[in-house]
Amino acid sequence: AVRTQSIAASPPPITTTSLPAAKGKAAKTISPEDMAVIRRQAEEFMEAKDRLPELATLVNERDWVFTRNLIRGPMQPLGREMLYINQRLLPQDRKEADKRAAELKTALAELDEAARLQDGSRLTKEYSRVASGFGAYAEMIPAEALS
């Protein structure tokens, strides 16, 4: 109903023959409002992703405390950011985005646990999962939101 109202309210008046085409097109694009939310959340996501080199240094130095601080501090809101993005993606993309977000959150939790246990080999393995998780999830963000 919301899409019909926004289509009907937009000038010029739409004839009944063009309305089904407009509805079909609306289902395949992200609304400007949703794209604005995605853009804001994607910016936060990319800021966390940009801290991967810092996290890698902490992992390589076996800096248990600051590894955990980075995960629990600046990277902590990632779950919420990905949730907000996923809710506004096209319906056909949401399941895969949810899967990739869950994998990244799990990898971060496992990295945090490896640092807590001071397990160096596990820390290195989990960092690799975190880095690939960031890359995999970033592919779900529409290019328009990153420009």
Name each region found by the language model.
Residues 1-147:
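N-terminal plastid-targeting presequences
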